[in-house]
Amino acid sequence: RSMIEACGMTDLAYDHEHVGPALYNHPNDFACTMLPAPGKWNHPDYRTTIDTYADYRRALRIVKVVSGNRNLRRPFTYEEICNALEHKSVINPILCIPSVSKGHGTGHLRRCLNLAIKNLADVYIPTDANLSELDSLVEKMEMEGLEKWQIISEFPTSKEYSLIITDYFSIPKQLIKDLSTLSPVASIDEGSSFTQYCDYLLDIIPSAKLNRVANLSNPGFIPLPKTRKSKDDALVENNKVLVSIGGEDPANLSLPISIALAECNKNVTVISANPLELRKQIPDDLLKNIRIVPPVNNLKERLYMYDIVVTHYGFTAFEALAAGCGVLLMETTSLHGVLAHKYGFALL
């Protein structure tokens, strides 16, 4: 009854939205007794109201932290909610920004999507992204735990995220300049000359000479395979060859190298984003030596099955070495060629 009366006594939007103030802000009309909540309910520093889109996304993280991959049909307990509010992803949300432009390969996007799954981070993919494998790769990662809401297409606002991570190879000046005004920025393997806008530089893949010093350079962060060749396996003839020149193969080298290897009587497995299209371009007499497969999930754990891995300079090259394979690199760009030569890889 008091609430009904209060509704007709105020025109203030704040009173109507929050309800309670319509009572306790008008002591001449209503008597309110403020009782302290029991300790387990009394957390004045926690905020669970949703007033902005950022608040909504924060609530989604809370739900994900509590429920994990389960579809809970019961109310959350206060302990679960309080514990979730202390989770790192809720306190300090992270945004990953990969390169999603045609010709840059899929490695940058893969790395950011994996970071998002493991750290409940968001991934910024603009609406004009033209990476051909974008949709299929995101769908595959959704099967591994990525939530649809973790992909955002709107540019972040100031202080919306505690940290922005870029994985761009060579980020445009205006983009990194804009990001630096919104949040601290950490850049992975950044090759541009605009690193003065970055707060932290992490170099993982050994690079060509750069006119700057990273905060940390450590190839130990390359995710090496657990499954490796035995010494006996390493002594067999080099007949089984894997061709994997990036998820995008921007230089279209998979076809000619596969044909050349098949002509040398090698048993070739080639990874292609468009297996049927690639198959049409292979001479009929060579099809018996060439097997075409779509992108392989967790490829690094299958590299040991091959004697030689043909790829370009990047994670797969180091993973193949660790797996005990012979490695042959293709010069997909001049920079890839320089890097392959600098670090002692066999190069075509």
PLM-predicted stretches and their roles:
Residues 317-348:
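Catalytic binding pocket for nucleotide-activated donors in carbohydrate/polymer assembly enzymes
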Residues 96-118, 127-215:
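Active-site and donor-binding regions of nucleotide-sugar-utilizing enzymes
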Residues 239-306:
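Donor-nucleotide binding loops and adjacent catalytic segments primarily
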Residues 113, 303, 321-322:
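Short alpha-helix at the nucleotide-sugar/activated-sugar donor binding site of glycosyltransferases
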Residues 1-47, 57-68:
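Conserved core of the sugar-phosphate nucleotidyltransferase
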Residues 122-130, 269-274:
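Short internal beta-strands
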Residues 304-315, 325-326:
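Acidic donor-binding loop of glycosyltransferase active sites
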Residues 77-79, 197-252, 273-274, 278:
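A nucleotide-sugar donor-handling region in carbohydrate enzymes
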